[in-house]
């Protein structure tokens, strides 16, 4: 019964957010600030899942005007956990098929996010090449999930290099954002599903990297994030 009630409430809330967010974003058509505002609306739904989410955002975060944020992509619960961490004037890059999701697809487009056609390597490469130009010309940041797909409990998957190429080309830092593990953590028939921690890590300077050693940068970021996720999981397990 609790599961059905939660599903009903979440569906109603998500539809309302999509409708209101679409109207709001049409008024401010593709304004880069739209994404962060709507993402935080979704990010406030976590109590409906019996979760307590701690958001760790550095005090000086607002001083960083342009960056590429990379997050770990676990499952659909990312919408109510790590989505809250999207910063002002940050747009995300998502697969083209998102446009076909009822209500959400039009919202994703009108807020100003960027679609990536993974089926067409040429178009995908061109999209990534344009990111560097947009970051500097429009004074915005980009949010990406470098795993390219939800890992669904398989640990942090190998990173694709698109985000790192874009950061090097634009000359902006990479900022990892991590969320503690949610795989098999949430039981919709259970009132209390525990705690989740989301954290923005320190910026990573990319000035010492080129396209020739971009995979070294990706591997370095992967190792940092993997280690930090394990530390957050351990912290939660200890009850802190």
UniProtKB/Swiss-Prot annotation:
Annotated compartments: Cell inner membrane
Cellular compartments per GO CC: plasma membrane
GO biological process entries: CDP-diacylglycerol biosynthetic process; phosphatidic acid biosynthetic process
Chain positions of motif HXXXXD motif: 73-78
Reaction(s) the record says it catalyses: a 1-acyl-sn-glycero-3-phosphate + an acyl-CoA = a 1,2-diacyl-sn-glycero-3-phosphate + CoA
Superkingdom classification of source: Bacteria
Cysteine pairs bridged by disulfides in the record: none
Predominant subcellular localization, coarse grouping: membrane
One Pfam short name: Acyltransferase
SMART domains reported in the protein's UniProt record: PlsC
Any one GO molecular function term: 1-acylglycerol-3-phosphate O-acyltransferase activity
Record's keyword terms, sorted: Acyltransferase, Cell inner membrane, Cell membrane, Lipid biosynthesis, Lipid metabolism, Membrane, Phospholipid biosynthesis, Phospholipid metabolism, Transferase
Topology within the bilayer: Peripheral membrane protein
Pathway: Phospholipid metabolism; CDP-diacylglycerol biosynthesis; CDP-diacylglycerol from sn-glycerol 3-phosphate: step 2/3
Functional summary from the UniProt entry: Converts lysophosphatidic acid (LPA) into phosphatidic acid by incorporating acyl moiety at the 2 position.
Protein family: Belongs to the 1-acyl-sn-glycerol-3-phosphate acyltransferase family.
Domain description: The HXXXXD motif is essential for acyltransferase activity and may constitute the binding site for the phosphate moiety of the glycerol-3-phosphate.
Protein name: 1-acyl-sn-glycerol-3-phosphate acyltransferase
Organism: Haemophilus influenzae (strain ATCC 51907 / DSM 11121 / KW20 / Rd)
Phylogenetic lineage: Bacteria, Pseudomonadati, Pseudomonadota, Gammaproteobacteria, Pasteurellales
């Amino acid at each position: 019964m609790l599961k059905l009630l939660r599903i009903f409430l979440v569906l109603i809330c998500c539809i309302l957010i999509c409708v209101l967010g679409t109207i709001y974003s049409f008024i401010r058509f593709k304004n880069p600030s739209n994404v962060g505002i709507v993402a935080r609306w979704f990010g406030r739904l976590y109590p409906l899942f019996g979760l307590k989410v701690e958001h760790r955002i550095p005090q000086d975060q607002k001083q960083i005007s342009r960056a590429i944020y990379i997050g770990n992509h676990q499952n659909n619960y990312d919408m109510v956990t790590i989505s809250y961490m999207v910063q002002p004037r940050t747009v995300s890059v998502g697969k083209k098929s998102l446009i076909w999701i009822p209500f959400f697809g039009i919202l994703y487009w009108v807020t100003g996010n960027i679609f990536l056609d993974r089926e067409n390597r040429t178009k995908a490469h061109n999209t990534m090449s344009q990111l560097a130009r947009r970051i500097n010309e429009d004074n915005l940041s980009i949010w990406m999930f470098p795993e390219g797909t939800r890992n669904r409990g398989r640990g942090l998957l190998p990173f694709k290099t698109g985000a790192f190429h874009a950061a090097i080309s634009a000359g902006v830092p990479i900022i990892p954002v991590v969320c503690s593990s949610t795989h098999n953590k949430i039981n919709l028939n259970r009132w209390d599903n525990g705690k989740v921690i989301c954290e923005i890590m320190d910026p990573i300077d990319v000035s010492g990297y080129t396209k020739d050693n971009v995979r070294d940068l990706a591997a370095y970021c992967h190792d940092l994030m993997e280690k930090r996720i394990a530390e957050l999981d351990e912290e939660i397990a200890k009850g802190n």
